[in-house]
Curated annotation (Swiss-Prot):
InterPro entries membership: Glyco_hydro/deAcase_b/a-brl, LamB/YcsF/PxpA-like
UniProt-recorded name of the protein: 5-oxoprolinase subunit A 1
Keyword Lipoprotein found: no
Its job: Catalyzes the cleavage of 5-oxoproline to form L-glutamate coupled to the hydrolysis of ATP to ADP and inorganic phosphate.
GO BP term, pick one: carbohydrate metabolic process
Organism, scientific name: Pseudomonas putida (strain ATCC 47054 / DSM 6125 / CFBP 8728 / NCIMB 11950 / KT2440)
Molecular function as annotated in GO: 5-oxoprolinase (ATP-hydrolyzing) activity; ATP binding
Subunit composition and interactions: Forms a complex composed of PxpA, PxpB and PxpC.
């Protein structure tokens, strides 16, 4: 692998409150794409605007990061809603960030659902298809960040919506190829995460929770800003990529 995108979730505070270590400003200097929270699981209009401004200043690509209506649970709890309700909510959030970004002269590069909604769309045919069908109408060139081999990835490829397949640096995988979703995120050793990423980039494999290697193809590395010690993890990973001659750049 000669080049890869490096993305992280940004703007996931709310008013005066922050999530994780509160290191968005510093972390932004190491990534190429920012997934900006759009108000339902975290974020607010002012935070969205400031995060777009910071990304623009650093040349970081911007994407919408819509979630379930779950501020209290940070979007990590599943909400039992119809496919139409979920897509209505996602389009609402997408539109909000799109206009805030447009006011700054920034065009959205991508959309990446958050947390439990990301996992729901990875498995639910009806909601995934309805979202992609709507994206084909309103934003046919918008990149859709998703898990390789997931339901939404397959549907997007089938319908012609461009996809960016992700590798999660700070989440565990099982042999099905899925990340192991958790509400209780633990810390990681920076060097171990960096080595895991380099192994995925060079060899195309990741060690699963079952203790076996899983082949994986991806276009972007994700490392979450709310993971404990996120700044150290991102810094170590970026330095390792640079030292290996792997160029970090946004897909567009």
């Amino acid at each position: 692998m000669q080049a890869v995108d490096f993305n992280s979730d940004m703007g996931e505070g709310f008013g005066p409150w922050t999530i994780g270590d509160g290191v968005d400003n510093e972390l932004m200097g190491y990534i190429s794409s920012a997934n900006i929270a759009t108000g339902f699981h975290a974020g607010d209009p002012g935070t969205m605007r400031r995060t777009v401004e910071r990304a623009k200043a650093l040349g970081v690509a911007v994407g919408a990061h819509p979630g379930f209506r779950d501020l209290v649970g940070f979007g990590r709890r599943h909400i039992n809603a119809s496919a139409q309700e979920l897509v209505d909510d996602m389009l609402y959030q997408l539109g909000a960030l799109r206009e805030i970004a447009r006011a700054q002269g920034v065009r959205l590069q991508h959309i990446k659902p958050h947390g439990a909604l990301y996992m729901h769309l990875a498995r639910d045919e009806e909601a995934a298809r309805l979202l992609v069908e709507n994206l084909r109408v309103i934003e046919p060139e918008l990149l859709l960040y998703c898990m390789p081999g997931s339901v939404i990835c397959r549907i997007a490829q089938e319908l012609g919506q461009p996809v960016i397949r992700e590798f999660y640096a700070d989440r565990e995988y099982d042999l099905s190829g899925s990340i192991v979703f958790t509400r209780n995120v633990r810390g990681y050793e920076p060097q171990a995460v960096a080595e895991r990423v380099l192994r995925a980039c060079r060899q195309g494999v990741v060690r699963t929770v079952e203790g076996q290697d899983l082949a994986i193809e991806f276009d972007s590395i994700c490392l979450h800003s709310d993971t404990p010690g996120a700044l150290d993890l991102v810094e170590a990973t970026r330095k390792a990529l640079d030292a290996a001659g792997i160029v970090v750049r946004a897909p567009r």
